[in-house]
UniProtKB/Swiss-Prot annotation:
<feature type="binding site">
    <location>
        <position position="259"/>
    </location>
    <ligand>
        <name>NADP(+)</name>
    </ligand>
</feature>
<keyword id="KW-0285">Flavoprotein</keyword>
<dbReference type="GO" id="GO:0005737">
    <property type="term" value="C:cytoplasm"/>
</dbReference>
<feature type="binding site">
    <location>
        <position position="51"/>
    </location>
    <ligand>
        <name>FAD</name>
    </ligand>
</feature>
<feature type="binding site">
    <location>
        <begin position="34"/>
        <end position="42"/>
    </location>
    <ligand>
        <name>FAD</name>
    </ligand>
</feature>
<dbReference type="GO" id="GO:0019430">
    <property type="term" value="P:removal of superoxide radicals"/>
</dbReference>
<feature type="binding site">
    <location>
        <begin position="286"/>
        <end position="289"/>
    </location>
    <ligand>
        <name>FAD</name>
    </ligand>
</feature>
<dbReference type="InterPro" id="IPR005982">
    <property type="entry name" value="Thioredox_Rdtase"/>
</dbReference>
<dbReference type="InterPro" id="IPR050097">
    <property type="entry name" value="Ferredoxin-NADP_redctase_2"/>
</dbReference>
<keyword id="KW-0676">Redox-active center</keyword>
<feature type="binding site">
    <location>
        <position position="286"/>
    </location>
    <ligand>
        <name>NADP(+)</name>
    </ligand>
</feature>
<protein>
    <recommendedName>
        <fullName>Thioredoxin reductase</fullName>
        <ecNumber>1.8.1.9</ecNumber>
    </recommendedName>
</protein>
<feature type="binding site">
    <location>
        <position position="176"/>
    </location>
    <ligand>
        <name>NADP(+)</name>
    </ligand>
</feature>
<feature type="binding site">
    <location>
        <position position="279"/>
    </location>
    <ligand>
        <name>FAD</name>
    </ligand>
</feature>
<feature type="binding site">
    <location>
        <begin position="12"/>
        <end position="15"/>
    </location>
    <ligand>
        <name>FAD</name>
    </ligand>
</feature>
<keyword id="KW-0521">NADP</keyword>
<feature type="binding site">
    <location>
        <position position="182"/>
    </location>
    <ligand>
        <name>NADP(+)</name>
    </ligand>
</feature>
């Protein structure tokens, strides 16, 4: 059993790094698979984080993740920027296979794989990705200087994308299916006050135009069905996220929206020794601070599980011969 670790954490972000910090401080020597592309989670694509406690003037998303990562590493967490391609979580010893085919074994697993950007599901959406269609304003905004840009969505992310893009763009049109926004009042006020931002209410993108690059959109009125053309060279999609749970289907229980189920208020899944935290579980709050909180809870749940497991193993050991 010498090659069996105490705990493996699949995923990063606030939940994964907090779980890594707590399990590392408990001397559990966690192995963390951060993800080859998604290391750090969604906050790596966020500009100012103004609502994470402890930072009076805010902090850049990547800086916050770098700080969390370094803190976990300081206490002994082993962090690997690699993907997990398969898992077997059903036995007492869990197996996790990385992209190189190496199999890692652990007594407990914490899942913090987060969520991914949701697509509109339209023809040309994927073909024009990187050619005018994007899901990340902080990544691609600079390339749209003095251009007409469209942002789709009505939540905080859409407002943040729009206000960030207004620094570069000639104009930003926010396309939203309804006649009011879901975003927080602070984010709404910021968008409404920006002279470069306008709104296309009760509208959805019906068609994406362009061969080699985006040239425009067809918008459809969600109430009347009428369509109109809108010239744009940039389309930023911010319509929500889907949980990254494909890896766990058939083993861990999922809800109707594909999120992992846990025995709330704990982070226990349906499989003994497997815990889940962050946006892979939460489709209600979806905040960095709540993800970090559940990452802490998952680490404590895993620590207590391992302690109970060690106690039971000691009890099961035969008494020495007299």
């Amino acid at each position: 059993m010498s090659d069996v670790r105490n705990v493996i954490i699949i995923g990063s972000g606030p939940a994964g790094y907090t779980a890594a910090l707590y399990t590392a401080r408990a001397s559990l020597q966690p192995l963390v698979f951060e993800g080859a592309v998604t290391a750090g989670g969604a906050l790596m694509n966020t500009t100012d984080v103004e609502n994470f406690p402890g930072f009076r003037d805010g902090i850049m998303g990547p800086d916050l993740m770098d700080n969390m990562r370094a803190q976990a590493e300081r206490f002994g967490a082993e962090l690997i920027p690699d993907d997990v391609v398969s898992v077997d979580l059903t036995g007492d010893i869990k197996t996790v296979t990385d992209s190189a085919g190496t199999v890692h074994r652990a007594k407990a697993v914490i899942v913090t794989t987060g969520s991914q950007h949701r697509k509109l599901g339209l023809p040309r959406e994927d073909a024009l990705s990187g050619r005018g269609v994007s899901w990340c304003a902080t990544c691609d905004g600079f390339f749209f200087k003095d251009q007409d840009i469209v942002v789709v969505g009505g939540g905080d992310t859409a407002m943040e994308e729009a206000t960030f893009l207004s620094r570069f763009a000639k104009s930003v049109t926010i396309v939203h299916r309804r006649d009011s926004l879901r975003a927080s009042k602070a984010m709404q006020d910021r968008a409404f006050a920006d002279p470069k931002i306008s709104f296309a209410w009760n509208s959805e993108v019906a068609t994406i135009h362009g061969e080699q690059k985006l040239t425009g959109l067809t918008l459809r009125d969600t109430k009347t069905g009428e369509t109109r053309e809108l010239a744009a060279t940039g389309l930023f999609i911010a319509v929500g996220h889907d949980p990254r749970t494909e890896l766990f289907k058939g083993q861990l229980d999922l809800d109707d929206e594909g999120y992992l189920k846990v025995a709330s208020p704990s982070t226990r899944t349906n499989l003994t020794g497997v815990f889940a935290a962050g946006d892979v579980v939460d489709h209600t709050y979806r905040q960095a601070i709540t993800a970090a909180g559940t990452g802490c809870s998952a680490a404590l749940d895993a620590e207590r599980y391992l302690a109970a497991l060690a106690d039971s193993e000691q009890i099961a050991e035969p008494a020495p011969a007299v």
